[in-house]
């Protein structure tokens, strides 16, 4: 009997993930408090918002935040695209706590305190640059059906300073500890020099640097910063709308998402040891992945439409799930599967929130 059971431990050994060290995953971005509500079309029209978009607040949106709170039933959630992804990754990883690090700028105020306590609850090692010139940033998530229109008032998030935070020895040490880096394209509007410093470090040390296209306006109005960092990007994330805008801005002359992924994959690259991978999600449609040799499509998990509560954060959650397996050097297919799993959990809840433990095997 004993002989027949012998191979078992061996099998377990192969599959048991290697123990992770703290701070193995590093993220940097705009920490925002999400103020989300289900709104009507009139509200979107009043502030000329598209149903499914991400924009930065302008003068004409000043009243929007007050009206949202006054007119609709709002929920407050700790948000910000990168911070969401980092939290989801930490949730999927579970142990050790503080496997994930997050940098960003907040104000010295109530909202800032909420973000700090929420990061601690999620076991993320958050190191915020705190300043009192601007209040903590907020993001209005205006939900209609399974669309969400995001209006970000960056405020404090916009005040992140490389020389005041990233460059400090006790902070930079955390960058050096990481093996995988993730920054949403949104942060290019705040501190492109911080993004570049981390990206260069990753390339020089053959570590994995990942970036998200984040929103159509990044490819349009922050093209220079985006393309300056692109040669350092090992894994590029985005959704179908962002991919289409990126392709148009780059003169790819195709609207086919697989072709776009292929062309983005082939853009110039600094660290030739790591060919780029491009991952484009498309809501309920297949996720498209381009590697050096092929373009593949992966079906998302079947979801009962009635169970979908809030698609805000689905893209962030996908990235978080993906990163949670990437830190273990799992194959691409496993990273995608984890991404799809995490997104499927998040869309059944309000905000980018999750149950106590994941059920991913």
Curated annotation (Swiss-Prot):
EC number of this enzyme: 2.7.1.20
SUPFAM superfamilies: Ribokinase-like
Gene3D superfamilies hit by this protein: 3.40.1190.20
GO molecular-function terms, A-Z: adenosine kinase activity; ATP binding; deoxyadenosine kinase activity; metal ion binding
Chief localization: nucleus
Cofactor: how bound: Binds 3 Mg(2+) ions per subunit.
Pathway listed: Purine metabolism; AMP biosynthesis via salvage pathway; AMP from adenosine: step 1/1
Modified how: The N-terminus is blocked.
Binding sites annotated in the UniProt record for Mg(2+) 2: 146-147
Enzyme class, spelled out: transferase
Binding site for Mg(2+) 1: 48
Catalytic activity: adenosine + ATP = AMP + ADP + H(+)
UniProtKB keywords: ATP-binding, Kinase, Magnesium, Metal-binding, Nucleotide-binding, Nucleus, Phosphoprotein, Purine salvage, Transferase
Gene Ontology biological-process entries: AMP salvage; dAMP salvage; dATP biosynthetic process; GMP salvage; purine nucleobase metabolic process; purine ribonucleoside salvage
Activity regulation statement: Activity is inhibited by 5-iodotubercidin and 5'-amino-5'-deoxyadenosine.
Disulfide-bonded cysteines: none
GO cellular component, one term: nucleoplasm
Active-site residues, record numbering mapped to chain: 316
Cofactors required: Mg(2+)
Superkingdom of this protein's organism: Eukaryota
Localisation: Nucleus
Ranges spanned by the short sequence motif Nuclear localization signal, renumbered to the chain: 7-15
Family the entry assigns: Belongs to the carbohydrate kinase PfkB family.
Subunit organization: Monomer.
Protein's name in the database: Adenosine kinase
Species this chain originates from: Cricetulus griseus (Chinese hamster)
Taxonomic lineage of the native organism: Eukaryota, Metazoa, Chordata, Craniata, Vertebrata
Gene name in the database record: ADK
